[in-house]
């Protein structure tokens, strides 16, 4: 029957009718594999009726279903091939039952069949792998089945290896090692041999027993019993005996009846014993899973006590960790003793375990160590028990013992029972002390604790019965009590009393029986109260000594040792003496004053204090004198210039020490004495010429140095003090014997002349006269100048007495006290400026810097430090570390640079230096942009000096660099930063700035001094910080200080008391505009505050100005009456009250000037104008006013000044939106957009019609707002008017009168009338519309010009006395723009001068091209070069001879040059600048005479010759320019070029006109010109001008009316010029020839040519027309001769006789062009020079001789006819007025070259 609960499948395969042997096993393995077949647990049975078929029984049905669902099944059998399997459900259940029946039958007979030996192939098939267990061997006889195939070798030694056993078995059995397995079990000292092939194991054992090797190895072989027990391992949790029994009895698992189950849960294993041994074969071959956990099954042999694992290693499971608990105190104890824990850990490791100590509780976790695996299974089983036993043994060495103790008792004794050997802990809840530690320690300490408890208990009882008292006694008084016998006496009388002293609380504690305590307290108090004290003054040196010694020890030495019961203590700066009695106090004072002393030793050379000898001496002295206690101290003061040693202490020791140290210093100190010898020339003379003196000095060990480095010029003597002083006297005697004289010369070039051959001249003077000579340089920089060779760019006054100088020069050679070096953080001077300074300074500078870094660390950017200067000529060098530039951190870089500069200035101030030089820090390798760098440095300097009111030691700050680019950047930065100030002009080196002229106000930056001596200072700071005697404050009428920003800032600093006092002062006073109240200053830095009620501006009303003037004057009067020195005014009224800032600045300064001039001031010296640094407008206004007055622009007492034309038109400003304002003379002129009817003024002007009743535009608005009364008044006055205007009342408008003018009339005339009318009525303000721009339709530009012109005329005539302000109110914004443009056009200009008719005429005639005023501005700089020579010699005679020789030499070298030329008059700014440059670069002096005109040059010959060439080139250039200008004038007379712009034609200027005409005549296609300052190209073909942007203008050429060309001229064929040769038959030829031949008949005429030059002809005729008109009936024209050379002919033909020919061949009668009456004069070879072919040329010329007079050689223009009228000149000059033979013409176009005669001899 079928297996219950199984699900069968029928399997057929491709193996045929005779299936292979063991196929059953292969199929079972295949279908058991889920991976190969999809199956699982199953059983395979062969169908007995059909051996080729098999039935597979699956237990879970779903497993069978999976096998069915898999389509292909293949069984791969190695060596036999692959078999295809077919699976299907069985046909009927009977078929299955039949299989089981057949199996039972075959089972019984199976062992009887096939007894014969199987063949080899069959034997191989029966072998199964060891790890799957062993199948029973086939074909084994039944009687052998109970004989074991396993042999055990017991008593296995450790030295027997598995190889040895295998070899033994092979030798004894004769089998190969493939036929058996050897398994060594070291835990039991046994090895088991399992035979794979059937042998006679009994015989094998017997053979082994006899084998000699077995005997030698002492092995005990025996036949291992056949077992029916298995060991099952890897059991899952939850298994038990019953479930295991059921599992292994299940046939599905291959099991059978179980005899016994022994389960080992801790090992997850069990022993299963079966009744039937054969079951083992099935189970061992079956793969078992228990609760889805795969099981490991091994045969178990009881005789061995273990299972056989075969090739598998036994699964050894280590025991689980377990915990042990320690007593908590013991655990705490061990936690504090790490070494004990380590000892326990080490001991437990021997038990193969590891301990983990809990950090929170007394738990110890014990885990098996990895080494336990090697100890074997028996040891593993007993591991936990063994470990617990060992730990218990260790724990027994320690003890925890509690002791019952009261908490109060414990607090008392706990500090006495501390012992590090054990843990002592108090349990508050249990009131027990717990002792934990090693047993012996705990027992020992327990005894001590119990004894301490007992003794303490008794002590507490005694204390409860005793008394404790505290007394406050100072340490000093306690010191005296201790040294008196009182305390010892008390302790003797009262032995039970305790006396102790707490120095911290200064309490003296008495403890003991109450009677004893009270007695002791009374006696101590009595003693303390009788003590006496006294403060005495001692010197600072002695006080310092007492500070350094211990007062107790020194009091014992000073007082107690002398039996004086006293002590000293330091109290503040005095010494407090305390004694037990007044008598002892007197003795103590006497003792202190007599026993202590100090002495000083001045040390000139500090180096002596740094030597080892000095250090050793002072050390030994201090050691000797201060053995105990200290009796002397030695202080070395080396920070000052001269060092000092102070010895302080006990008199005897001080005297001894002083004597020794003084002698040492005198004997070892070297000193220097510099004998300053001036001039330095004397030093050279003494050094060379007085050689006999120096060896005498050197014999006494005094070193002599001439002109030592880094010191003043002189002779330095170095040596011992006595010898040096003697040597100084010798040097002075020698010096006095020398004669020195200086000679000064102002000959130009003298200095350079000497310098060129200085060595030669010096050697000659020495050879000839025995003297020394030198050129005296500026040794000391004069005020305003700079050192020699260093260029000063600017000077700016920073503060009174402090100047900022920008100068180009070498930072290592400057006349300053200290310089700033741009350094890096490490003060390593590797490159750039730092390297240059370091090289000049020598190694001392770098060494000192290294010490600074070592001492103070690296310097961070933004810091500065100071070091020695080494060999540099400075006291110190300041090293400033600037930042490295980063664009991302620019603000930080600027901050750091600013900080570095300011710290450098602070260091200079700290060391009391007067001058400092600063370079462009960080601008080099640190990459700081130069512009940003210099601006930051200048700003930092400005802040340091201008915003700090404290006094400054620094008086000169130099900004220096060798690079001109850097210095220029510095100068520009100074100009920018100080733009509101007027810097001094940079004076040339060595020259002081010009002093202010008499009557002018002296001016420094922010400073003015009035003629009366009152100083005015411009101070930029808040009013609350003012430090003057008096401060002025602006307050409202209610006197509330918190309402205004000015008074509020004062109130905040002064405190509320200021308001309270002001209220008190104001009571009973009628406060109104102009009231001045005086109060105290309270917390302010001044002495008094003057509170003023300032007026509102009210458009500049007279009353407001008057009140403000009265306020200012009264404040100064109060200051003077209080006998105070200074007063400070803020810009009162310029804020909410509306005073314009520039008007207030002018008003207050004017009032101060007036007050100073009218009063004899006794005490008032300074008036400060306080301006907040952020109030830039007020600062600018005051700075402008300061600068204006400093320039001599002093105004009168009144604010306006009519006649001052300096800067007649002021600058245009915009005080409010839509308002523009400027000064016109003394009048404030405003234009504003708005409604005129809302304005407030003395007069409002109405622009109306002829009938004065216009009801349109502005007139309508004015009449309607003014009211009906004004209209009626207009009607009445219109009928009776005598002028073009009428005056009515103001009506409802805010004015006194309305002046009605006619808008269509002349606007300038109308405004002038209004101004005059207002002046008559003393009105100060006028408001008018843009007259005529409405219905009269006048152009706004013309109206604006007319109004401004009217005001200008009014002011210029001096009429403006009352009128202060004129305001134009405009309705239309475009009209406002026109007015603004007109104001800007006149901004900053002066009055225009009017040109007279005569001057215009003179200009036309060529007398003058420029006004003389302009030339007066061109002044040739006066060069005052001088040289001073210093001569040194033996006596006066030698020196004077040498001076005379030098003067003669210089005089001979001087070379003069003179040039007299008319063109010198035409020199303009360019020529003057060139002349000035010549003076600068050459050793010459140039003087200029404008009248002659004449240039004189004086200097050394080579420079004079160079100047001559350049001056003559200048004259030639000017002459050519004038010729061009003359041509331009000529051309412009009849040709005019114009361009058209916006349909308006504009003329080109005359030079451009000439340029265009020349280009046209030269037939150029294009020419470049300028139109309105833009470049245009004119196309002469299309007549268009095009600019660079393509914008085009049309151009045209106009021909003016001109003189007709002579009719006899030949056709010029559109040429501008031609020469026509005349035929001898022409009448013209004959006429000219006959005239020539009258005096030149001996010459042969080759040809006569007519010159046809229309331009020259027109110019000549125009000049003739003018002369004819001027001279009336005079015959103005003559035909004369003029001889010339061939080279001049082309020029004359084209240009005529212009000024370039003036004086060319003669100057006897003037420097003009000469024309002769007779031809023979001109034909002379002097004038008509023959060419190479012998041809000569003479012109027959038309000359305008006009009215003439006698000439002379000095004339460059004709003389005047009348001395009273210098512009009315003669036309020409002649040699003889009555019989002239020649004429001299001076002007262009005064002659026309009509005919050219070519002839030869």
Curated annotation (Swiss-Prot):
Residue sites binding a glycoprotein 3 per the record: 1235-1236, 1247, 1258, 1332-1336, 1371
WWE domain sequence ranges: 1523-1601
Top-level EC class: transferase
PARP catalytic domain ranges (all copies): 1605-1801
Presence of the UniProt keyword Repeat in the record: yes
UniProt GO BP: innate immune response; negative regulation of gene expression; negative regulation of type II interferon-mediated signaling pathway; negative regulation of tyrosine phosphorylation of STAT protein; positive regulation of interleukin-4-mediated signaling pathway; positive regulation of tyrosine phosphorylation of STAT protein; protein poly-ADP-ribosylation
Domain of life: Eukaryota
GO cellular component, one term: nucleus
UniProt GO molecular function: enzyme binding; NAD+ binding; NAD+ poly-ADP-ribosyltransferase activity; NAD+-protein mono-ADP-ribosyltransferase activity; NAD+-protein-glutamate ADP-ribosyltransferase activity; nucleotidyltransferase activity; transcription corepressor activity
Catalytic activities: L-glutamyl-[protein] + NAD(+) = 5-O-(ADP-D-ribosyl)-L-glutamyl-[protein] + nicotinamide
Positions contributing to a glycoprotein 2 binding: 1023-1024, 1034, 1046-1049, 1133-1137, 1175-1178
Domain Macro: 791-978, 1003-1190, 1216-1387
CDD domains referenced in this protein's UniProt entry, alphabetically: Macro_Af1521_BAL-like, Macro_BAL-like, RRM1_PAR14, RRM2_PAR14, TCCD_inducible_PARP_like
UniProt modified residues of type Phosphoserine: 33, 1403, 1411
Record Pfam families: KH_PARP14_1 (PF23084), KH_PARP14_2 (PF23248), KH_PARP14_3 (PF23249), KH_PARP14_4 (PF23251), KH_PARP14_5 (PF23252), KH_PARP14_6 (PF23253), KH_PARP14_8 (PF23254), Macro (PF01661)
Assembly behavior: Interacts with STAT6. Interacts with PARP10. Interacts with PARP9 in IFNG-stimulated macrophages; the interaction prevents PARP14-mediated STAT1 and STAT6 ADP-riboslylation.
Family membership: Belongs to the ARTD/PARP family.
Record's protein name: Protein mono-ADP-ribosyltransferase PARP14
Organism taxonomic ancestry: Eukaryota, Metazoa, Chordata, Craniata, Vertebrata
């Amino acid at each position: 029957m079928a297996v219950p609960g199984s699900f069968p499948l029928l399997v057929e395969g491709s193996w045929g009718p005779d299936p292979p042997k063991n196929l059953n096993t292969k199929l079972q393995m295949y279908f058991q594999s889920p991976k190969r077949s999809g199956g699982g647990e199953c059983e395979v049975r062969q169908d007995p009726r059909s051996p080729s078929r098999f039935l597979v029984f699956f237990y879970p049905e779903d497993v069978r279903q999976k096998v069915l669902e898999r389509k292909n099944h293949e069984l791969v059998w190695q060596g036999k091939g692959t078999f295809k399997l077919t699976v299907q459900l069985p046909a009927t259940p009977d078929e299955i039952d039949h299989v089981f029946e057949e199996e039972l039958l075959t089972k019984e007979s199976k062992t009887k069949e096939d007894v014969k030996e199987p063949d080899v192939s069959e034997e191989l098939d029966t072998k199964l792998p060891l790890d799957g267990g062993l199948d029973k061997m086939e074909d084994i006889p039944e009687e052998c089945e109970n004989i074991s195939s396993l042999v055990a070798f017991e008593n296995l030694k450790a030295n027997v290896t598995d190889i040895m056993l295998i070899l033994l078995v092979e030798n004894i059995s004769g089998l190969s090692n493939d036929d058996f397995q050897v398994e060594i079990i070291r835990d039991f000292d046994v090895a088991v041999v399992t035979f794979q092939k059937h042998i006679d194991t009994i015989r094998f054992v017997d053979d082994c027993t006899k084998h000699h090797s077995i005997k030698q190895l002492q092995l005990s072989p025996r036949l291992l019993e056949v077992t029916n027990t298995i060991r099952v391992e890897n059991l899952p949790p939850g298994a038990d005996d019953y479930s295991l029994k059921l599992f292994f009895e299940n046939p599905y698992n291959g099991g059978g009846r179980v005899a016994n189950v022994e389960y080992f849960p801790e090992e997850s294993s069990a022993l299963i014993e079966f009744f039937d041994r054969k079951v083992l074969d099935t189970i061992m071959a079956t793969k078992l899973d228990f609760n889805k956990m795969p099981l490991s099954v091994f045969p178990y042999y009881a005789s061995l006590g273990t299972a056989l694992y075969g090739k598998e290693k036994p699964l050894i499971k280590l025991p689980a960790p377990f915990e042990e608990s320690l007593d908590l105190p013991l655990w705490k104890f061990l936690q504090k003793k790490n070494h004990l824990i380590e000892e326990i850990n080490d001991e437990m490791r021997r038990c193969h375990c590891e301990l983990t100590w809990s950090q929170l509780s007394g738990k110890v976790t014990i885990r098996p160590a990895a080494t336990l695996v090697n100890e074997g299974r028996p040891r593993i089983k007993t591991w936990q028990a063994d470990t617990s036993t060992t730990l218990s043994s260790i724990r027994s060495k320690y003890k925890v013992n509690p002791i019952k103790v009261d908490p109060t008792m414990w607090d008392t004794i706990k500090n006495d029972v501390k012992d590090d050997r054990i843990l002592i802990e108090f349990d508050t809840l249990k009131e027990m002390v717990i002792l934990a530690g090693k047993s012996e320690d705990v027992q020992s300490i327990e005894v001590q604790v119990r004894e301490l408890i007992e003794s303490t208990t008794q002590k507490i009882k005694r204390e409860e019965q005793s008394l404790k008292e505290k007394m406050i006694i100072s340490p000093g008084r306690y010191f005296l009590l201790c040294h008196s016998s009182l305390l010892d006496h008390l302790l003797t009388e009262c032995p039970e009393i305790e006396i102790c002293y707490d120095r911290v609380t200064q309490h003296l504690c008495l403890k003991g029986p109450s009677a004893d305590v009270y007695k002791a307290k009374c006696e101590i108090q009595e003693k303390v109260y009788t003590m006496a004290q006294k403060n005495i003054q001692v010197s600072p040196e002695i006080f310092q000594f007492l500070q350094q010694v211990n007062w107790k020890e020194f009091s014992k030495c000073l007082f107690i040792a002398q039996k004086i019961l006293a002590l000293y203590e330091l109290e503040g700066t005095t010494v407090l003496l305390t004694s037990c009695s007044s008598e002892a106090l007197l003795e103590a004072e006497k003792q202190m004053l007599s026993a202590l002393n100090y002495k000083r030793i001045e040390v000139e050379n500090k180096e002596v204090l740094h030597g080892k000898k000095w250090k050793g001496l002072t050390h030994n002295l201090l050691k000797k004198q201060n053995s105990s206690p200290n009796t002397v101290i030695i202080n070395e003061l080396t920070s000052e210039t001269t060092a000092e040693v102070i010895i302080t202490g006990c008199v005897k020791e001080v005297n001894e020490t002083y004597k020794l140290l003084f002698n040492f210093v005198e004997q070892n100190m070297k000193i220097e004495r510099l004998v300053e010898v001036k001039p330095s020339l004397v030093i050279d003379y003494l050094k060379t010429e007085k050689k006999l003196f120096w060896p005498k000095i050197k014999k006494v060990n005094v070193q002599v140095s001439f002109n030592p480095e880094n010191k003043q010029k002189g002779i330095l003597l170095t040596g011992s003090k006595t010898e040096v002083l003697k040597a100084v006297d010798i040097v002075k005697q020698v010096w006095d014997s020398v004669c020195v004289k200086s000679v000064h010369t102002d000959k130009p070039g003298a200095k350079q002349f000497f310098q060129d051959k200085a060595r030669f001249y010096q050697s000659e003077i020495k050879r000839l006269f025995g003297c020394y000579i030198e050129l005296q340089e500026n040794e000391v920089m004069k005020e305003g100048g700079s050192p020699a060779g260093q260029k000063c760019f600017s000077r700016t006054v920073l503060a009174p007495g402090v100047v900022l100088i920008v100068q180009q020069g070498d930072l290592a050679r400057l006349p300053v006290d200290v310089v700033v070096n741009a350094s890096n953080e490490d003060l390593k001077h590797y490159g750039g400026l730092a390297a240059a300074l370091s090289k000049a300074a020598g190694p001392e500078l770098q060494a000192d810097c290294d010490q600074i870094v070592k001492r103070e660390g690296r310097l961070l950017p933004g810091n500065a430090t100071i070091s020695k200067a080494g060999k540099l000529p400075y006291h110190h060098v300041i090293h400033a570390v600037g930042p490295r530039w980063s664009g991302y951190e620019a603000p930080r870089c600027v901050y750091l640079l600013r900080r570095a500069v300011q710290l450098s200035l602070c260091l200079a101030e700290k060391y009391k230096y007067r001058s400092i030089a600063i370079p462009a820090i960080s601008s080099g390798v640190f990459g700081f942009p130069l512009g940003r760098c210099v601006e930051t440095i200048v700003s930092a300097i400005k802040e340091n000096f201008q915003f700090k009111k404290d006094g400054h030691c620094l008086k000169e700050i130099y900004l220096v660099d060798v690079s001109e680019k850097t210095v220029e950047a510095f100068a520009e930065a100074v100009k920018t930063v100080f733009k509101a100030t007027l810097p001094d002009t940079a004076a040339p080196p060595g020259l002081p700035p010009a002093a202010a002229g008499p009557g002018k106000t002296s001016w420094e930056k922010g400073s003015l001094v009035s003629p009366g001596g009152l100083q005015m200072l411009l101070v930029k700071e808040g009013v609350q910080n003012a430090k003057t005697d008096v401060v002025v404050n602006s307050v409202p009428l209610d006197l509330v200080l918190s309402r205004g920003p000015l008074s509020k800032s004062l109130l905040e600093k002064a405190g509320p008391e200021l308001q309270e006092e002001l209220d008190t002062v104001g009571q009973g006073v009628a406060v109104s505009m102009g009231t001045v109240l005086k109060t105290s200053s309270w917390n302010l830095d001044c002495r008094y505050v003057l509170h003023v009620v300032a007026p509102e501006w009210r458009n500049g009303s007279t009353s407001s100005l008057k009140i403000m003037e009265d306020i200012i004057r009264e404040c100064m009067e109060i200051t003077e009456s209080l006998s105070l020195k200074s007063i400070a005014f803020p810009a009162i009224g310029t804020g909410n009250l509306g005073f314009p800032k520039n008007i207030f600045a002018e008003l207050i300064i004017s009032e101060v000037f007036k007050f100073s001039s009218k009063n004899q001031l006794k005490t008032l010296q300074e008036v400060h104008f306080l301006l907040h640094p952020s109030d830039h407008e007020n600062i600018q206004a005051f700075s402008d006013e300061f600068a204006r007055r400093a320039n001599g622009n002093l105004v009168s007492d009144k604010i306006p000044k009519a006649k001052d034309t300096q800067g007649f038109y002021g600058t245009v400003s915009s005080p409010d939106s839509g308002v523009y304002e400027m000064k016109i003379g003394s009048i404030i002129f405003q234009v504003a957009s708005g409604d005129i009817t809302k304005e407030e003024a003395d007069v409002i002007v109405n622009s109306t019609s002829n009938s004065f009743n216009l009801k349109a535009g502005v007139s309508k608005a004015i009449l309607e707002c003014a009211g009906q009364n004004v209209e009626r008044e207009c009607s009445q006055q219109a009928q009776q008017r005598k002028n073009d205007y009428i005056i009515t009342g103001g009506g409802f408008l805010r004015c006194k009168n309305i002046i009605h003018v006619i808008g269509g009339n002349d606007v300038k005339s109308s405004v002038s009338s209004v101004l005059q009318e207002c002046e008559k009525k003393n009105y100060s303000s006028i408001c008018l519309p843009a007259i005529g721009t409405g219905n009269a339709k006048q152009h706004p530009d013309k109206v604006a010009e007319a109004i401004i012109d009217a005001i200008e005329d009014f002011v210029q005539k001096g009429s403006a006395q009352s009128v202060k302000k004129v305001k134009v109110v405009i309705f239309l914004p475009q009209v406002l723009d026109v007015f603004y443009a007109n104001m800007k056009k006149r901004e900053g200009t002066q009055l225009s001068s009017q040109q007279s008719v005569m001057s215009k005429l003179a200009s036309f005639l060529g007398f003058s091209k420029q006004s003389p005023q302009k030339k007066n501005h061109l002044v040739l700089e006066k060069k005052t070069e001088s040289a001073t020579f210093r001569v040194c010699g033996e006596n006066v005679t030698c020196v004077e001879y040498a001076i005379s020789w030098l003067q003669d030499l210089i005089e001979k070298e001087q070379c003069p040059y003179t040039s007299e030329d008319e063109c010198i008059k035409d020199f303009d700014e360019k020529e003057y600048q060139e002349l000035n440059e010549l003076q600068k670069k050459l050793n010459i002096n140039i003087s200029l005479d404008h009248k002659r005109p004449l240039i004189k040059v004086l200097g050394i010959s080579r420079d004079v010759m160079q100047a001559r060439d350049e001056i003559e080139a200048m004259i030639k250039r000017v002459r050519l320019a004038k010729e061009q200008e003359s041509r331009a004038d000529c051309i412009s007379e009849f040709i005019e070029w114009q361009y058209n712009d916006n349909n308006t034609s504009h003329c080109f200027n005359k030079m451009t006109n000439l340029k265009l005409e020349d280009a046209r005549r030269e037939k150029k296609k294009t020419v470049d010109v300028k139109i309105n300052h833009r470049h245009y190209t004119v196309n002469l073909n299309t007549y268009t001008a095009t600019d660079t942007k393509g914008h085009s203008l049309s151009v045209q050429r106009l021909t003016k009316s001109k003189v007709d060309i002579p009719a006899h001229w030949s056709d010029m064929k559109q040429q501008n010029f031609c020469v026509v040769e005349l035929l001898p038959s022409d009448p013209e030829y004959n006429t000219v020839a006959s005239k020539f031949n009258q005096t030149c008949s001996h010459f042969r005429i080759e040809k006569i040519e007519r010159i046809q030059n229309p331009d020259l002809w027109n110019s000549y005729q125009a000049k003739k027309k003018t002369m004819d008109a001027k001279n009336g009936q005079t015959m103005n024209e003559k035909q004369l001769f003029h001889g010339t050379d061939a080279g001049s002919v082309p020029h004359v033909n084209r240009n005529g006789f212009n000024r370039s020919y003036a004086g060319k061949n003669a100057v006897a009668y003037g420097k003009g062009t000469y024309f002769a009456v007779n031809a023979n004069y001109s034909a002379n070879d002097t004038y008509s020079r023959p060419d190479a072919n012998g041809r000569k040329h003479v012109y027959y010329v038309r000359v305008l001789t006009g009215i003439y007079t006698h000439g002379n050689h000095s004339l460059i223009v004709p003389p005047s006819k009348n001395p009273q009228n210098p512009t009315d000149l003669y036309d020409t000059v002649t040699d003889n007025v009555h019989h002239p033979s020649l004429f001299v013409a001076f002007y262009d176009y005064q002659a026309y070259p009509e005919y050219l005669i070519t002839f030869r001899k």
